[in-house]
Amino acid sequence: MEVKIKQVDEVKISRYIIKETMEDWYQFVESDVVIVGAGPSGLSAAYYLAKAGLKTLVFERRLSFGGGIGGGAMLFHKLIIEKPADEILREVNIRLKEVEEGVYVVDSAEFMAKLATAAIDAGAKIIHGVTVDDVIFRENPLRVAGVAVEWTATQMASLHVDPIFISAKAVVDATGHDAEVISVAARKIPELGIVIPGEKSAYSERAEELTVINTGKVAEGLYATGMAVTEVKGLPRMGPIFGAMVLSGKAVAGEITKDLLKSEIRA
């Protein structure tokens, strides 16, 4: 096959990448919301926050998104979604197969690809290969005001490199089972009064309900979604049923949107 391809030399390749990357970082160094983790709850939250018009930045330590979605159930490529979470998946055109009334099977690759695409199309910025190392805090009133970030590769190499800071009106811990951001804040800012009892063993029916109910603010400016909620609130895990994950993301997005709107009204 003969084809005419535009000639682009190495200097232009590098310059365009550096310029556009730096413009993104410069713009998002002051964000409305920073979400840590691009798993199901983080992507769901990003979709609804960006859709609400908030400047939303998602940091993912890996070079891919989806979190636990990609692993499916013990590497089986299917997952379970139950009502009313199916409405969120339908909203972003993810296909579902009903296996009993109100219970659906979803393909894991389609689930994470379309959910991520929906968040990006809504206006969220997702940056891979970045680890959130710490938080920014302020006093009077005491609150979380952003995050400190580092390249994941730098941390893996155990290099002593200072982070850079990203300001945010709200920080969402969507890091999963370890609730990494909230754990750091609890340890380093004891004045926040955060106590983390840890996640319990599996009890799927209760876990799905309790995770959504307990989603939300942990301290001023700091929120939990998804499996981070189970860790922070001492709730059971649920395994490869993902309804609560996307519902939790939507719930935290709604709470943050209301909180930021209230703060703008007061200002």
From Swiss-Prot:
Pathway as given in its UniProt record: Cofactor biosynthesis; thiamine diphosphate biosynthesis
Taxonomic superkingdom: Archaea
Binding residue positions for glycine: 237
Binding site for Fe cation: 162, 177
Reaction it catalyzes: hydrogen sulfide + glycine + NAD(+) = ADP-5-ethyl-4-methylthiazole-2-carboxylate + nicotinamide + 3 H2O + H(+)
UniProt EC number: 2.4.2.59
List of residues binding NAD(+): 41, 60-61, 68, 132, 160-162, 227
UniProt-recorded Gene Ontology molecular function terms: iron ion binding; pentosyltransferase activity
Keyword Transmembrane helix found: no
Key words, A-Z: Iron, Metal-binding, NAD, Thiamine biosynthesis, Transferase
Cofactor: Fe(2+)
Function: Involved in the biosynthesis of the thiazole moiety of thiamine. Catalyzes the conversion of NAD and glycine to adenosine diphosphate 5-(2-hydroxyethyl)-4-methylthiazole-2-carboxylate (ADT), an adenylated thiazole intermediate, using free sulfide as a source of sulfur.
Family membership noted in the UniProt record: Belongs to the THI4 family.
Assembly and interaction partners: Homooctamer; tetramer of dimers.
The name this protein goes by in its record: Thiamine thiazole synthase
Species, as recorded: Saccharolobus solfataricus (strain ATCC 35092 / DSM 1617 / JCM 11322 / P2)
